[in-house]
Amino acid sequence: MGKPTGFLEYERETGCVISLEERIQNFNEFHIPLSSEMQQKQGARCMDCGVPFCQSGMMIGGMVSGCPLNNLVPEWNDLIYNGNWEQAWRRLMKTNSFPEFTSRVCPALCEAACTCNLNGAPVSVKENEHGIIEYGYEHGLMKADPPKVRTGKRIAVVGSGPSGLAAADQLNKRGHQVTVFERSDRVGGLLMYGIPNMKLDKAVIERRINIMKEEGIEFITGADIGNNYKASRLLKEYDSVILACGASNPRDINVPGREAKGIYFAVDFLKKTTKSLLDSDFEDGNFISAKGKNVLVIGGGDTGNDCVGTSIRLGAQNVIQLEMMPKAPDQRAESNPWPEWPKICKTDYGQEEAIALYGHDPRIYETTVKSFIANDNGEVCAAELVKLSWQKDPESGRMVMHEIEGSNEIIPVDLVLIAAGFLGSQSYVTDAFGVEVDGRTNVKTEPGHYHTSEEKVYVAGDMHRGQSLVVWAIREGREAAKCVDINLMGYTNLD
């Protein structure tokens, strides 16, 4: 705790953003980080708490409080304040494989658990994490450091999202020879094609992948294991296989008119947009156009918000976002005390842009689609909506959804994007390896373990725990790497 009075002297700062009017004209990142001087002041606000909940990653009230990676937040905040950026970088890299990703896309569980929340605003931990990792790149700390000794063991990682990359990075550091198989044309999985460029610039991903390649990790793209590439080949040629394919099976909505043209899953919409942007800056036309259209986004989560922001940048005439649940309160309820994750209403970047552009919040709460209406060409032209109410079931005690009679409304719609979550991984992958899955189609393991029902096969990330955050995927990848290392070598020295 370099400055005991820091939290009293300095206010929370979170950097700036490019104006709404300017940023919606392109797909560039729009967050402007704090200066190093401002980051040092944020480091001074850290109180080096006796119990630092920011790094705890513990379950409270059924949700995680603090960083799942157990990042050493008080340590590197103090190091930043004292100007020791290199040591701060070393302490950050000890626990987090990819701070350049989490400092851009993580919802900052650490900040929600910060003790400063009790009497004010939290330390800007996410800003400081971003500052540390970018310092590492700017000052030559982030460079290839291949292992000096190889173990002779070969490991295949199926999937190059955050969990697969984290597992590959750790196992390569241990000296194993790692090959990562990716079904798409670019490495990165969810990071590359599931998150829009304005949230995570793809050059940031490629910058890190290039270092991993220099360190000896092999990447094979266009390899769809279980489809155009046999699982049996991997089991024969590698000592261990880690499945890290994500939860890529989107949840559909089965209502009348679903077969109409112009209705897409959000993941397809976002992927096509990013691919066309990277391939040709949209010159190839291989994306789903929203220009001049009334867009309906079904789903109120992060993916739904990304669809709102992407639709705006593609020239949508209007955007409506449906949320089945009631609007969350603006402040914590008494039943949701600190350090629990705050269950409050958040207006994200896409919604902010819609409010500024269209003059209204795009979100409509407690509402769902009853049916879609198509024109004579089979194209969606309208959607029938219905209001919902939530009532507690007297027998189960659970909240049950009911449609409100007479609340039906028809709105014009030209493009529908379904962002209703995911149901697990693609079954052809699990079938190809013969691994057991649970009732939610996640790959089954013993609690707290990563070894599947097949001897050589392990699992990590959303494919293991279900749809979750990038920070959780990184943790899963690191933990799975330890499991593999122990089984191959008899022990592990991985963090």
Cite the ranges covered by each PLM segment:
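Glycine/serine-rich phosphate-binding loop and adjoining beta1-alpha1 elements at the start
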Residues: 40-44, 48-56, 62-147, 213, ...
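Conserved hydrophobic helix-helix packing surfaces used for dimerization/oligomerization
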Residues: 155-157, 178, 295, 457
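FAD-site-proximal beta/loop scaffold in flavoenzymes
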Residues: 259-292, 392-467
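Feature captures the FAD/FMN-dependent oxidoreductase FAD-binding
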Residues: 87, 149, 154-158, 206-255, ...
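A conserved FAD-binding loop/helix module that cradles the flavin
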Residues: 304-307, 314, 463-494
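Beta1-alpha1 glycine-rich phosphate/pyrophosphate-binding loop at the start
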Residues: 5-32, 44, 57, 68-80, ...
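Glycine-rich Rossmann-fold phosphate-binding loop(s) that bind the pyrophosphate
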Residues: 159-162, 299-301, 462
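C-terminal catalytic lobe of FAD-dependent flavoproteins
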Residues: 12-34, 42-45, 365, 373, ...
